[in-house]
Amino acid sequence: MSNKAKKISWTAALVAAGLYAAPAASEVRLMSYNIHHCAGADKRVDVRRVAEAISREKPDFVGLNEVDQCALRSHGIDMPEELGRLTGLHATFAQAIPLQGGGYGNAVLSREKPLSVLRVPLPGREPRVLLLCEFADFWFGTAHFALQETNRLETVEIIRRVVNEKAASKPMFITGDWNCQPESAPIASLRTFMAIISNEKCRTFHGFKKHAPDTVSCIDYIAVDRGAAARVKVKESHVTPDEMTSDHNPIVVTIDLTKGPGHLH
């Protein structure tokens, strides 16, 4: 009997004996949302309205951009804490800049409490930040790219270094408002080490304006590092049209994540 045949026979025996487990998959619902500091089309800051928009999607992990924390323009509300309370999720905040007595940046809402948190400064005329949270099975985070192309290209290279360093042992999902279209140079560069799993053919940014149905402005994304892409099966991906709550639409991806190779118990 060849070595290959022996290996197949041994694996079959383990399966029959209940000692070998096939890779387990778990369903995870991911969301990305630029919330425009909870200021809607009516210019009213309404945290509850944003929380309801999030809760309707029933996400497990949410990356939020343009989040105020205790800033004067949003009535001193600690938005990460309040959104966490209203959605029943853990809240983690990373400040990009100080703002009116408080801060402004990104947040992650999560069903699980993070094991660790990484904050990485990103370039821009207005400084930006990458927020990454480590969980039991993967990293999840969000980045808000700058408006300038050169800064966006620099940001992609910073993210590449982080992925190379941190994604060796766990998959890494990065979401966010990246301020560039799918055919842009920064996205082309990012695709060399990340696989975009969100819908790229739907409008994610509307700017509180009506648009022709055949025009698309996709600048918000959900992606996974290419090293883990084979372990991710996209079950469903959509963008929810909402021209009241924020100037961006929420984007959602439901995946099956294979936790790892078969193993002996």
Language-model region placement:
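N-terminal, active-site-proximal structural segment of metallo-dependent hydrolase catalytic domains
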Residues: 2-14, 18-86, 98-102, 158, ...
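Structured beta-strand-rich core segments of catalytic domains in phosphoester-bond hydrolases
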Residues: 27, 42-43, 67-139, 231-241
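Structural recognition of the beta-strand scaffold that forms the well-ordered cores
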Residues: 31-32, 61-65, 108, 132, ...
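Sec-exported extracytoplasmic/periplasmic mature domains
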Residues: 55-59, 84-88, 92, 114, ...
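Metal-dependent phosphoester-hydrolase catalytic domains
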Residues: 119, 150-151, 157, 161-173, ...
